[in-house]
Amino acid sequence: MYNDEVKFSLWCDFIERDFLGGEFVNLIQNGVISGVTSNPAIFKSAFTTSEVYKETIKNSGLKYPKAIYERLATQDIKIAATKLFKNYANGDDGFVSIEVDPTLSDDAAATTDEGVRLYGEIAMPNVMIKIPATKAGFEAMSALTSRGINVNATLIFSPEQAMGCLDAFEEGCAAYAKKFPQTPLPKSVISIFVSRFDRLLDERLRQSSLPTGQVGIMNAAKIYNLIEDKNLPSVRALFASTGVKGGDLRPDYYVRELMYKNAVNTAPLDTVKEFIKERAEPKNAPSAENINSFFEVIKRAGIDMNAVYKELMNDGLKAFEVAFNEILRAL
């Protein structure tokens, strides 16, 4: 873990074959990162811009684009999982996430089946199957957890989504523990998206003469507190979408501000590099009272957070589907 004192972990939200063979190993060995996450947008960039994949595609013998995509993705995930296995074996995270086909986000059975299949194909115990936090996704999370499969619940914007994930993991872990009482529970993370709130709302807040760059942090803190209060032993809060795109914020702002006890932060590679340049101190999450007061001000500014949650979730699902379909067209 990046900070053992408060059990704060830093993971890298990036995966690419050349990176896995060099810089990735150095970051692990130096104790900077202890996990890695991926998504269709990350794989799209890697598969369509890096020369290293062309030979694999040429020699794959596979006809269908999705089969080629899965071959490339599972190879990268397995390489990463192998390099992180020592961390995993020592109880120091070591997890690697791969997302199911995002076009299945409303189909619980298909999501579950694909998660089981991908987990089996990669055949590494430190793989997490990444599932969007939709209603169908909650069912799949419970089903996979009950089978002993680690899950990364993704695209969490609202407290209600987080509670759905917590209920699913609690149910799945209970079913698994009943079948295998002497076996450790599968691990899960609830990925709370952060920076997208500020990119969406900051201009409106400026027009109301309100501080910017805070909605994402306060919303993340609210959900983090829910997760910590639930106190499920195998579930942690993970902060995602923590890169800064333009504006006046320092590049590692969302990592430094969310360096909470027992939390994970997955950040783009450039953000990770920026973060380790200067020592960072752990922080305490704001109290429920302070968070509620903050969102009362936001409400008075005419911002409907429920509408914001819905917009960001729809945009997130669409972005992953677009990236996934663009990969398939390119392959």
Question: Where on the chain are the PLM-derived regions?
Answer:
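N- or domain-start disorder-to-order transition segments that initiate the globular core
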Residues: M1-E23
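Catalytic beta/alpha-barrel core
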Residues: D13, P125-T134, I149-Q161
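Active-site-adjacent beta->alpha loops and helix N-cap segments on the catalytic face
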Residues: G21, D107-D113, I131-T145, S158-F169
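Glycine-enriched alpha-helix->loop->beta-strand junction motifs that scaffold or abut catalytic
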Residues: V32-S34, A140-V151, E170, L185
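Conserved, mostly hydrophobic/aromatic
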Residues: N39, I98, I129, L144, ...
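Active-site beta->alpha loop and helix N-cap motifs at the rims of alpha/beta catalytic domains
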Residues: I42-K44, T49-A140
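Catalytic alpha/beta core domains of metabolic enzymes, predominantly
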Residues: N150-D270
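Flexible, acidic glycine-rich loops studded with aromatic residues
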Residues: P233-A330
